[in-house]
Swiss-Prot record:
Domain of life, source organism: Eukaryota
One GO BP: maturation of LSU-rRNA from tricistronic rRNA transcript (SSU-rRNA, 5.8S rRNA, LSU-rRNA)
GO cellular component: mitochondrion; nucleolus
FT transit peptide: 1-25
EC number(s) recorded for this UniProt protein: 3.6.4.13
Binding residues annotated for ATP, in chain numbering: 157-164
InterPro entries xref list: DEAD/DEAH_box_helicase_dom, Helicase_ATP-bd, Helicase_C-like, P-loop_NTPase
Native organism: Candida albicans (strain SC5314 / ATCC MYA-2876) (Yeast)
Full protein name: ATP-dependent RNA helicase MRH4, mitochondrial
Length: 555
């Protein structure tokens, strides 16, 4: 695939960082419900943009199964089937997906427990019958207020930790529980509403169309599995035996780029209520321009649950107004769930401004927040030394060649993601690799914001699905290379991608965490190669790999 560029003596000049033995610390006492975050690296200066003063959530190690968590039975079964369907079976350890025991991740344990907590107040020591009229009325009013007030959850966990199902599991459980309670109290009303209701029950907001597609496809897969409901508690049986509940039976819809909002109203008219709408804030704000539809925002009057995925982005300067405007159209909102892999300092300040009473925030933060998983190996390449002599493209070409010949992922097409800082660099790098370094045009694509959404989707497909066998690839590719910017560094699940190259350093620590997080997802191994020169060489770069091994936070 590649022309050999460098004499043999220079082959594989990618130098792994020196690994220093970490100093053993004395045994620590039993952890308390909250723990102070561990030290972090480069936590000062302009590069440092992450907030690291949040306490973490204590996560009980006794929970080792989704069966131990409060999840609606059909949601649990569909979720496990969906996770297994996306599991990477490469390697000798497992030959059959049924051998895989799917366990909840720390963020899934913590978020599901917090979000699914009962809203009802505990009855005081003396029961309701033992209260006088004044006490009973006061308790019932307080209970009603607790049930109806909006709760705000923040869910923060490291990249690749399973955050999508950490909010989907409680969200879908609440939707199904609401349906079951409605059916038990009024079967006829439930059936009529299911067929004719014209409203949206919940909304998931995301910053990019790629993420809208990703979450929508996750829900579509989960909704496609036939369920047997084995082991479901008796109080669920009659509801689960309804004909429509042979699957999870969640109605979903997405509004992405090029999809007119009027589609939502057509679907409501023909198919009834939508359980989950997945879209961007701008799409809902655009409803105000629908002059041919009477009171278009009326369909959101019954929204009870809203998720802001990649919440730090949705509250940055370019999204904040649209995001807050959208939320104001949900008058019956019960749960607002803010999800992110990073808590930037700017985002934390905005949270404090939006919710000055910090008691109104229910925080979930895993101990590994802002840490890069230890299964990611970071290596630096100095473009200033021979044979590169200051040429970062030459350095990149040699790195691509070395990866293609290293003997890993035998039989499969290797996927490599290359990050640059400016979208203006993308096309130039792709052109250089093809014309000067003889990379096949079929093996490399460049994706930036200037590429239309339909083409972007096609170009990204090989990276968003499990690796193909070389013999099955349409172009006979042994590697596929994606050159892109931070546009694609957030949230996207590049399935099983083992190699990421940073062509220079990102602007800040937030972007660094997200770029590193495109590999090593869900406990799989990954490698990151950081190409630096005299302009981008920082003293801490050579210590980054050691910081990861030691479990330090990115500052």
């Amino acid at each position: 695939m590649f022309k050999l560029l460098i004499p043999n003596k220079y082959n594989y000049v990618i130098r792994p960082l020196v690994r220093f033995k970490s100093i053993k610390s004395p045994k620590s006492p039993k952890p308390k419900p909250t723990a102070k975050l561990s030290p972090n690296v480069f936590s000062s200066g302009k590069f440092s943009q992450l907030h690291n003063d949040t306490s973490t959530t204590n996560i009980e190690s006794k929970i080792t199964s989704f069966d131990q968590l409060k999840i609606f039975p059909s949601v649990r079964e569909a979720m496990i089937k969906e996770i297994k369907s996306q599991y990477n079976l490469k390697g000798p350890r497992h030959s059959n997906i049924d051998e895989i025991d799917i366990k909840p991740t720390p963020v899934q344990i913590a978020a599901i427990r917090k979000i699914n907590q009962t809203r009802k107040l505990k009855v005081p020591n003396k029961d309701l019958e033992g209260m006088d009229d004044a006490e009973r009325i006061q308790f019932e009013l307080q209970n009603a207020n607790e049930i109806q007030k909006t709760k705000v959850f923040t869910v923060a966990a490291e990249t690749g930790s399973g955050k999508t199902w950490s909010y989907l599991a409680p969200l879908l459980s609440k939707l199904k529980s609401d349906d079951m309670e409605f059916w038990k109290s009024d079967p006829e009303g439930y059936d009529n509403t299911r067929k004719k209701g014209q409203f949206v029950k919940s909304v998931i907001l995301l910053p990019t169309n790629e993420l809208v597609d990703q979450v929508y496809e996750t829900l579509q897969r989960a909704n496609s599995f036939e369920l047997d409901h084995k082991g479901a508690p008796g109080n669920f049986t009659s509801f689960l035996e309804l004909p429509e509940n042979k699957t999870m039976n969640i109605t979903t819809m997405k509004l992405g780029q090029g999809e007119a909002p009027v589609r939502l109203f057509r679907q409501l008219e023909t198919k009834g209520p939508i359980d989950v709408l997945i879209t961007t804030p701008g799409k809902i704000v655009a409803f105000s321009k629908l002059v041919n539809i009477n009171r278009p925002f009326r369909v959101f009057a019954n929204v009870k649950y809203c998720v802001l995925d990649e919440a730090d982005t949705l509250f940055d300067d370019s999204f904040e107004k649209n995001t807050t405007d959208v939320i104001t159209h949900f008058p019956k909102l019960l749960d607002l769930i803010l999800v992110s892999a990073t808590i930037p300092k700017v985002f934390e300040k905005k949270l404090s401004k939006l919710f000055p009473d910090q008691r109104s925030l229910i925080r979930v933060a895993t101990p590994s927040l802002h840490k890069v998983p230890r299964n990611i190996k970071v290596m630096t390449i100095d473009a200033d030394v021979a044979p590169y002599n200051g040429s970062k493209p030459r350095c990149l070409a040699q790195a691509l060649y070395a990866i293609s010949k290293d003997g890993t992922e035998p039989g499969y097409v290797k996927r490599i993601i290359v990050f640059v800082n400016e979208k203006s660099e993308v096309d130039g790098i792709v052109e250089s690799m093809i014309t000067k370094y003889k990379v096949r045009p079929e093996d490399i694509v460049g994706v930036s914001g200037s590429v239309n959404i339909r083409d972007r989707k096609d170009m990204l497909q090989p990276f968003l699905q499990p690796a193909e066998l070389i013999e099955n690839d349409d172009f006979g590719s042994k590697v596929k290379i994606l050159v892109t910017t931070d546009l694609l560094a957030r949230g996207l699940n590049f399935q099983g991608v083992k190699n990421v190259i940073l062509l220079g350093l990102p602007r800040n620590s937030v972007d660094l965490v997200h770029r590193l997080g495109r590999t090593g997802r869900m406990n799989q191994n990954g490698r990151v190669f950081v190409i630096v020169d005299k302009k981008s060489k920082k003293s801490w770069v050579k210590g980054l790999g050691n910081a990861i091994i030691r479990g330090l936070r990115i500052g």
